[in-house]
Curated annotation (Swiss-Prot):
One of its GO terms (cellular component) is prospore membrane. This is GLC7-interacting protein 1. The lineage of its organism: Eukaryota, Fungi, Dikarya, Ascomycota, Saccharomycotina. Residues 372-388 have a biased composition (Acidic residues). Residues 116-140, 220-247, 352-361 have a biased composition (Basic and acidic residues). Residues 110-143, 215-264, 352-396 are annotated as: Disordered. It comes from Saccharomyces cerevisiae (strain ATCC 204508 / S288c). It comes from the Eukaryota. One of its GO terms (biological process) is ascospore wall assembly. One of its GO terms (molecular function) is protein phosphatase regulator activity. Interacts with phosphatase 1 (GLC7).
Amino acid sequence: METILQPKARPFESLKRKRFREWLRPSTAHGSLLHSDTLDLRDFAKPNPADTFSNLDSGHCPLVTTPIKYECPDGKSSFFRGDTKFETLFSNRKFYEFKDNLKRGLKKIRHGRNGHQSEKRCPVVEETKKSVSDNLDKPDNNTPCFDRFHTNSKEFETQFDHSNRSQNSEKAYLDNESCWNLSEKFIPFNNLKYEDLKHFEENLQSLAPATFTPIESNESLDRSDSTRGTKRSIRNDSSDTTSEKRLCLKQYSDEPESDHSMESTPSIYITKEVQERIEALSSTDSFLIEKVDFPSNKIGSSASDYESDNEYRNMDEDSINDVTTEKEGNVVIPDSNTSTVDAMEKPIEVSSALKDDTLDKDIDDASSSYSDDVETTFEPVESEELSDLSDTSSSGSSKIYTIPTFRGLTNRTNISQILSKVGKADLSQDNLTHLIKSHQKKKRCVNFRNKRFYDAFNPYVDNEEDAELSDSENISEMDTDLCIKDRSTSSVRFDENSRLLIYKKSKKLNKDETQSGYSTTEMRSILKTKMNSQHDEESQRASKCDTVGVAQFLHYFQYTEYKRQRNEAENYRLRGEQLSKYYSEEYPLDFAAVECEDSVNDKSDIILSMRATERNIGRQLKGISSQGAQIISLDEDVF
């Protein structure tokens, strides 16, 4: 009869241990010893190549195996696991042996893998040398990005020559025309050789200061070195070439050429020959002067430079004031120190703004000008003879005048000179208004730097004095530049007219509320708002006024009355101290000094005050004489 062992009950066995036990001993778990997993000792003793632990070194870490079926030494009888108590203990021992074998096997496998990888990473020195030599001969595919983009050193020179190769290999050098084209549109630097750049620089230094096409801009001011001269080109935006006015101008400067002198605009003068030719051709709309022989531009004229400069200095300055900015043109100012052979061959574009003969006679017919040593300081004055414009406001101590706007760039003429002439009645508001209207009508460029501006309103100036002053007059350098400068360029704009306020320092200025410029800000209260620190307490009291009880109210009333009575004695002492200070020797009343008509009234007022004090305190003050109102020092026991 077959005996079936039931598994032992293990109430405190964990689920994880139970599952491991079922996997390790399936026969015991199912309650049968005759399970297909039963092994014979002879089968178990044979080495299994598929077993993971069979490849390990048996001498180093021998495996402990426990069979499931055991045979006796006599070979007749055999027994299985679990038949007796000894078999059960032997089964538990097998479990621990299996655990040890498993740990050793995993450790051996891990050690074997690490050793195999180290052998691959660290080969023998001979094998390493051999592999390196093989890699040099045979390209490695581990760096495909480097193999794709790297460049051999032999190809560097070829690539450099190819990148620096000129686009136009047939043309070795550049001519003058191509140089100017390059100045407008630069060729890439990689396409120019060293010889081309060197030749380009030499051509730029040797070119004459002739008129050239301006670059795409409204107004170009080209400044070059002293060897090339100063060139200035003003673009003509007008598309109608027939209406161009052309004028030949000459540059003059007393100072030697330097980098600092080139920063300021040079003075421009017009020769008498050019003026005569312009007057002769003033009837035509446009004309062209092809060649002008300046004395300073002739070859071998170094000896007569001083005479030619004086000749340009003694010119007619009326023509300079006639230059207008309404009609624009191209003006070129050549330098006298540069060669002008090529410049004379080309036509010089000039501006004929002197055609208009209907100029302001008040300025052209002036015969003299005021001296430069005018007072730099001016005391504001008030003149009743000065008339006001419709938009000019005035008051008893101040006046506002409308004057043309000018730029105070020099120290020779400032606004104090204008004010001094207004104070002397040489310049009035009527004359200023007439001047403003004439400029607006004729679009003329007139400013206060020209001394003739003041001569136009002075009819008592001698003509001889004007002739002497005109010889030594030197026009500001920036004046002509402002006249010729193109209005279409982007620059700072100023109003044509300005407001001038004249007032007296000794009088207070009456501000007019109707004038926005003198209007004050809104009136603000000088009282400062303070936060109420007892706002919360007061709000709570107000909310509890309707809910307070009678008993609580009486209790509060009695408390306040008790507090008032307690402080009454202190209040009595404070009142007496106040009265003693009021009628004391520290502040005596000097009745002897009061000897005027109101002395009787003053004495009676003092007596009335003392009587009122006695009524308030309920007793009579001591020390007061019945015959007079003299105050005597009070003792401490008055009250």
